[in-house]
């Protein structure tokens, strides 16, 4: 839809962090950062015609530990991402097949990332990482359009949910990589496992 928008966004995005190298093998760290992002053009053109999209704000808290030797690396990273007006995928598409988004007032992503790398010899390395997370919208309100037999919009029904999973955000991810090197030749085998995820923010099973 045609738009005539003159919108200004002023952001202050600080970041602070602490890093402690306990010795040559052990390291711990922690950080806090603020990230804000303005809506894209598509958020305006494909959004609700009665209201403009809002800027997204993130408060990111992270802490972790790493261990490293000449043949082994391992680490754990804990994170909590607190969002205000996060722009999330709705599961719907526009007229040309692009994914639609909407603002949700209060949401979060939290979890732990585990990493392991092993290099037992010069020609082989194994890297694996896994993420367990909880990605939720607090007090999600689902707006359901109601049409007549000729697809004319009659009304919009609002359904309140307590806490729902964010669309396209699985609770578990696993990545695995085997890498081989020999006299300038390199090859790798990669695999990924993605846990259960939903195509809408209302956790609809039958889609």
Which residues make up each language-model segment?
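Transmembrane beta-barrel architecture of outer membranes
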Residues: 11-15, 48-50, 58-62, 99, ...
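Membrane-embedded beta-barrel scaffold of Gram-negative outer-membrane proteins
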Residues: 21, 27-33, 54-110, 115-119, ...
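Outer-membrane beta-barrel translocator domains and adjoining extracellular loop/strand segments
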Residues: 1, 40-48, 86-95, 133, ...
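Extended hydrophobic-aromatic, low-complexity segments
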Residues: 29, 40-41, 74-75, 85-87, ...
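Signature of Gram-negative outer-membrane beta-barrel scaffolds
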Residues: 1-23, 38-39, 142
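Extracellular loop and loop/strand-boundary signature of outer-membrane beta-barrel proteins
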Residues: 2-5, 45-52, 60, 97-103, ...
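Gram-negative outer-membrane beta-barrel transporters
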Residues: 80-82, 102-203
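Short sequence motifs at beta-strands and strand-loop junctions characteristic
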Residues: 6-12, 53-57, 66, 104-108, ...
